[in-house]
Structure formats: C-alpha cells, structure tokens
C-alpha cells in the first residue's frame, strides 16, 4: 500500500516537509510506502472552468497537477500539506487542489486522506478547514490524530522543536496505516461502500 503526499510549500524542505516526513516515518514503520511530491516554486494556474477535463479526463493544463493525478490513481491514501499564508492555505496549493479535484476526483474517491498545516503562529485551523473540504465533498474518509494536524515554527529547525506537533504527525501516520489496513481487510471480506447516483439541484429548484 502507498500514501501519496503533496508538499504545498514553496520551501521544499521547510516546516511543511518536516510535518509530512514525520507522518511518513510512522507510515513506513507500519509497512506503508510513501512518496512526497513537492509543488515547486513555478507559477501554478488556477481552474479556468473550461470543463475540458470532462472530455479529456485530465486538466487541459498539462503540468504537475496531471502528473500527480496519474500517481493518485495508483495510491491508496493521501496527505496534503500546506503552510499558512494570511490565515489560509497557500495560494499555489489551492490552485493545485481545485484543478486536481475538479479533473481527477474519481481517482481519489473512497481513499483515506488527511491534511497537515504548518504555521509560525496563527491561522492553522482555518487552513485545516479549507483543505478538508476537498476530501469531504469527494467521499474520502478523513483521517484524524490526537490534535488538529498542525506544526509550529518559522524554520524547519524550529518545527523540529515542536514536540507535540511532531507527535500529532506520528499519530496521524499510525491512524492512516490502521485505516488503510481496515479497508484492505474489508475489501478482502467483500465489503464495499454502497453507492448512490448523484442528484444535482440548485437552491431555487
């Protein structure tokens, strides 16, 4: 089994990376493979609403989003990490996840997911809420820890001093591994989620 992670920070080995790495270690100890994909520093386009993905089954902008989507099809779970920018998720990861979930959500449906957030001081829970909304609209079990998944520090070195934050990430990794194994056991026993066809309505009808 494999958990695919996204480092949504412009700093490849900063605080967000520390958080993801700590969760990855716990997953690895449970026999779960992990991969961390870095979002990079290059400008990332947001969703233009062109709806071409409905025909192409991928985003019309062929960049890291589509590369991640290909990996997502083979992954069993996900952890998305973001720094806090102005008390919310970083702009790049919002653009990334908007396009990823609009074009390739089927590749992630029913697969467990979590987000981790890094901040110097405040805005962590607001960012946490933003990222979790992608999972909860896509029928993805959300994995929790013993606290909200946040780590504090202005540098990677400072984040490594946040002992409670590091424990939160380890517990998250252990819980993710446990849920993945439960799902695998359920499938082996013939247990699958019961599906319903989506009903689309507007508020006025």
Feature-to-residue mapping (PLM):
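Helix-loop-strand module that forms the ligand-binding subsite of alpha/beta enzymes
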Residues: 57-147
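A short beta-strand-loop structural module common to alpha/beta enzyme folds
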Residues: 32-42
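N-terminal beta1-alpha1 ligand-phosphate binding loop
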Residues: 2-30
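Short, hinge-like loop/turn segments at secondary-structure boundaries
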Residues: 51-55, 132, 161-162
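Cysteine-cluster motifs in flexible loop/terminal segments that predominantly coordinate metals
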Residues: 42-72, 200-205
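Glycine-rich phosphate/pyrophosphate-binding loop and the adjoining helix
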Residues: 141-205
């Amino acid at each position: 089994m494999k958990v695919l992670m996204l480092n949504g920070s412009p700093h490849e080995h900063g605080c967000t990376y520390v958080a993801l790495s700590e969760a990855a270690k716990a997953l690895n100890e449970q026999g779960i493979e992990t991969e961390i994909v870095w979002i990079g520093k290059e400008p990332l386009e947001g969703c233009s609403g062109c709806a071409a993905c409905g025909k192409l089954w991928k985003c019309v902008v062929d960049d890291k989003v589509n590369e991640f989507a290909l990996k997502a099809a083979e992954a069993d779970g996900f952890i998305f990490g973001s720094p806090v920018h102005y008390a919310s998720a970083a702009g790049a990861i919002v653009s990334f996840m908007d396009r990823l979930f609009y074009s390739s959500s089927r590749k992630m449906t029913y697969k467990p997911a979590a987000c981790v957030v890094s901040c110097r001081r405040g805005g962590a829970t607001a960012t946490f809420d933003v990222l979790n909304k992608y999972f909860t609209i896509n029928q993805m079990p959300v994995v929790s820890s013993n606290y909200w998944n946040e780590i504090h520090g202005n540098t990677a070195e400072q984040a490594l001093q946040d002992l409670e934050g590091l424990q939160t990430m380890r517990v998250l990794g252990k819980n993710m591994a446990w849920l993945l194994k439960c799902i695998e056991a359920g499938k082996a026993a013939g247990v699958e989620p019961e599906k319903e066809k989506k009903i689309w309505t507007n508020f006025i009808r």
